[in-house]
Amino acid sequence: YPRRLQAEVMLDAIDDLAGTRTDFPNLPPGTRAIALPDNSYNTSSPFLRVFGRPENESVCECERGQSSSLSQSLHLMNAGDIRGKLASGSGRAEQLAKSELAVEQKIEELYLVAFSRKPTPAELQTAVEYVISPQTDAAGAPIEPARAVREAFQDLVWALMNTREFMFNH
């Protein structure tokens, strides 16, 4: 049956998809969450706390929560650390927006990183239409094209990381 990814695995997967990294205090840059030596790093990572990285008060793996919660959904939708990963100047969305590849190739790259598969024809069509559609700001004024493409790729990364296929082992 499908099970949600463990907190550390999900954080590393989000970093892979977003093309970013999470730095932890007193550890070398690029240390992955799955390699954290102990639970003291939970306090510096709201993501790990919200997604249930155990405090290791016992040796039982049963201490780890696997249920989904409203706070987890809200964290993926609104949290500053997630928004920062999406908007990173060196992140995947920014790199894809600047890339000379065809839009279809860029979207295939996102799907391969997120799901280890190419998008279905329907998924590809929907994503391409979204990326190339004219974007407007809250007042209805057109957004500058480079910014619109960058924000469209940020939205696609965000949408993919919020799917069941991304968050769950099957």
Predicted regions mapped to residue ranges:
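An acidic, gly/pro-interrupted, aromatic-rich
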Residues: 1-118, 160-170
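Ca2+-coordinating acidic residues in Ca2+-binding motifs
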Residues: 9, 123-126
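Structural motif corresponding to the C-terminal cap of alpha-helices
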Residues: 81, 135-138
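Amphipathic alpha-helical segments that form the core helices of the histone-fold
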Residues: 125-136
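Intrinsically disordered, low-complexity Ser/Thr- and acidic-rich flexible linkers and loops
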Residues: 137-145
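Globin-like tetrapyrrole-binding proteins
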Residues: 156
